[in-house]
Curated annotation (Swiss-Prot):
The keyword ATP-binding applies. The gene is hscA. Pfam families: HSP70 (PF00012). GO terms for biological process: iron-sulfur cluster assembly. Keywords: ATP-binding, Chaperone, Nucleotide-binding. Chaperone involved in the maturation of iron-sulfur cluster-containing proteins. Has a low intrinsic ATPase activity which is markedly stimulated by HscB. This is Chaperone protein HscA homolog. InterPro entries: ATPase_NBD (IPR043129), Heat_shock_70_CS (IPR018181), HSP70_C_sf (IPR029048), HSP70_peptide-bd_sf (IPR029047), Hsp_70_fam (IPR013126), ISC_FeS_clus_asmbl_HscA (IPR010236). One of its GO terms (molecular function) is ATP binding. It comes from the Bacteria. Belongs to the heat shock protein 70 family.
Length: 618
């Protein structure tokens, strides 16, 4: 007889048999894979001892490809087929991609999504990212000589549902079981929280190759709560490379036209940037088709050329603190994440803003992968005690459209996830059997000023009087930040739902703009909402009155009918204007003018109900 093994939920059946779970930092410039071995999180090296894998894929033809260092080495001579910084393309449309002209490979638009033209054909960012993830998966399986149980993959804090879903799709294509997606700052907090047993409020300043994130986290007794986020998904070390390349070309007067020359200048710019981390000056040198670009570059020149980029990061930090209602002095420390934070001007700018030196006791290139590995180890059931609770937040409010084009927020901005929130709605017209739902994202009061996420329809609502149906709309945001919306008519049980997967995401600049607009137009939005609500109430009153007149108008005398008709005409005229108070006044006037009619209808209804019935039967 076969025996069933019973174990604690979430724990491996055999306490001596550990599941192999890894953390993956899928970065714009570099990617890493880490795992917990002998109780310590560490990054896994390749066969040459290198833990970093450049996030680069070169397509030679339909069958052959190079990934990582080999691809990067061939970038200068085959720039058109060497794809770097693909993370910037994840879940985006062509119009959203910044610095397209500086990219050495060709982007195309397919069905609203950006793709890349290569020697192997048209490739999506998901397919290209899958090549990188698969390489890291093979590295981990070779290290442990076994199959992986799963992986925790990190994403920027501001990745929205579409970008997160694209990351999960890439992982699935690479043969990985995704245990969870967590934000990069949260992963860094895990690594620092465990190593230092620190509690309090911290800022995680994460400047990677292609994205910048600032997160304000509260660490309390194993609970990691993100209380504010900000950043820029189109700002990173790559932009410092571009800025330096532009500066050198402007100083030397050189022109670059070919993709190979552009790639060569960028490679030289990156090398100079890295050298200036420790040196005060460096000789910039790039071999071009028409000769060579040579320039003696001082660190002060590099700092000045890239100061606007550094200032953008500090502006985002300042805004995140405002959102969290904190001052720089309220923080216990600042954690630096990402290889780009090695630049002296970054550390200096952060120290000047906060008035203290940032924490740098963990390798900024590795800290995100290490935190993801710790979380993966726990989700695999390898660490039963001391589990961490991770509380990320959603960046913009979620809601649905109501009558008049107004937004009813259901999940507020900065709500911690995972979460599920519900609200009841009803029908607008008598006999209504379907309800169209429009899911939106944003902070403004009018749908026209927010971002549309999805539309779906609840059908099969039993016909009943307007306002009688009870429809519960539930928003569920899972631990990966993915949204699903359901609507259920409580009486009949009919239900409809939608999983929200936007065709492409918002950049952090767009999110910041939406938030700023919501602040600057708050008074205007409030007035606009009041006007729309007044018009909706007026329309509802007119519909109800007309329905009553159609059904029981014979109860009225000529004078009574004339008074109501005149009052309805005044309300219709008022509703055409922009004076909310006047519309509200006309609505109340119609309500007063129909009070006697309502009483007559009620008496007539009671009389009909009692007609023909004997007293003893009541």
């Amino acid at each position: 007889m076969a025996l069933l093994q019973i174990s604690e939920p979430g724990q491996a059946p055999d306490p001596h048999q550990r599941r192999i779970a890894v953390g993956i930092d899928l970065g714009t410039t570099h990617s890493l894979v880490a795992a917990v071995r002998n109780g310590v999180a560490e990054c896994l090296p390749d066969d040459q001892g290198r833990v970093i894998l450049p996030s680069a894929v070169r397509y030679l033809d339909r069958e052959r490809r190079q990934i990582g260092f080999d691809a990067l080495a061939a970038r200068a001579q085959d720039a058109a087929n060497t794809i770097t910084s693909v993370k910037r393309l994840m879940g985006r449309g062509l119009a959203d991609i910044a610095n397209r002209e500086s990219m050495s490979y060709r982007l195309v638009d397919e069905g609203g999504m950006v793709k890349v033209e290569t020697a192997a054909g048209i490739k999506s960012p998901v397919e290209i990212s899958a090549e990188i993830l698969a390489t890291l998966r093979y590295r981990a399986e070779d290290t442990f000589d076994g199959e992986l149980y799963g992986a925790v993959i990190t994403v920027p804090a501001y990745f929205d549902e579409g970008q997160r879903q694209a990351t999960k799709d890439a992982a699935q294509l690479a043969g990985l079981n995704v245990l969870r997606l967590i934000s990069e700052p949260t992963a860094a907090a895990i690594a620092y929280g465990l190593d230092n047993a620190s509690e309090g409020v911290y800022a995680v300043y994460d400047l990677g190759g292609g994205t910048f994130d600032i997160s304000i986290l509260r660490l309390t007794q194993g609970v990691f709560e993100v209380i504010a986020t900000g950043g820029d998904s189109a700002l990173g070390g790559d932009d410092y490379d571009h800025a330096l390349a532009d500066f050198v070309l402007a100083q030397t007067g050189l022109q670059v036209g070919s993709d190979a020359d552009k790639a060569a200048v960028l490679v030289a710019a990156r090398a100079a940037k890295e050298a200036l981390t420790d040196a005060d000056s460096v000789a910039f040198h790039a071999k071009l088709a028409g000769g060579a670009a040579r320039f003696d570059l001082a660190r002060a020149q590099f700092d000045a050329a890239t100061k606007p980029l550094t200032d953008r990061t500090i502006a985002a930090v300042r805004k995140a603190l405002r959102d969290a209602k904190l001052k720089p002095d309220d923080l216990q420390g600042i954690v630096l994440v990402g290889g780009s934070t090695r630049m002296p001007q970054i550390r200096r700018a952060v120290a000047e803003f906060f008035g203290r030196e940032p924490l740098v006791n963990l390798n900024p290139d590795e800290v995100v992968a290490l935190g993801a590995a710790i979380q993966a180890n726990q989700l695999a059931g390898n660490n039963g005690a001391g589990d961490l609770l991770l509380l990320d937040v959603i960046p913009l409010s979620l809601g649905i459209e109501t009558m008049g084009g107004l937004v009813e927020r259901i999940v507020p901005r900065n709500q911690t996830i995972p979460t599920a929130m519900a609200q009841d709605f009803t029908t607008y017209q008598d006999g209504q059997t379907a309800l169209a739902l429009h899911v939106v994202q944003g902070e403004r009061d009018l749908v026209a000023d927010c971002r549309s996420l999805a539309r779906f329809t609840l059908r099969g609502i039993p016909p009943m009087a307007a306002g009688a149906a009870r429809i519960r709309v539930t928003f569920t945001v899972d631990a990966d930040g993915l949204l699903s919306v359901s609507a259920k008519e409580q009486g009949s049980g009919v239900e409809a739902s939608v999983a929200v997967k936007p065709s492409y995401g918002l950049s952090d600049d767009q999110i910041a703009t939406m938030l700023q607009e919501s602040f600057s137009t708050a008074q205007q939005d409030m007035q606009a909402r009041a006007l729309v609500e007044a018009r909706v109430d007026a329309e509802r009153m007119l519909l109800a009155t007309q329905s009553a007149l159609d059904a029981d108008g014979d109860l009225l005398g000529e004078e009574e009918r004339a008074v109501i008709d005149a009052s309805m005409a005044k309300l219709r005229e008022a509703a055409k204007g922009n004076d909310a108070a006047a519309i509200e006044g006309a609505t109340k006037a119609l309500a007063n003018d129909t009070e006697a009619f309502a009483a007559q209808r009620m008496n007539a209804g009671i009389a009909r109900a009692l007609s023909g019935r004997k007293l003893e039967s009541l």
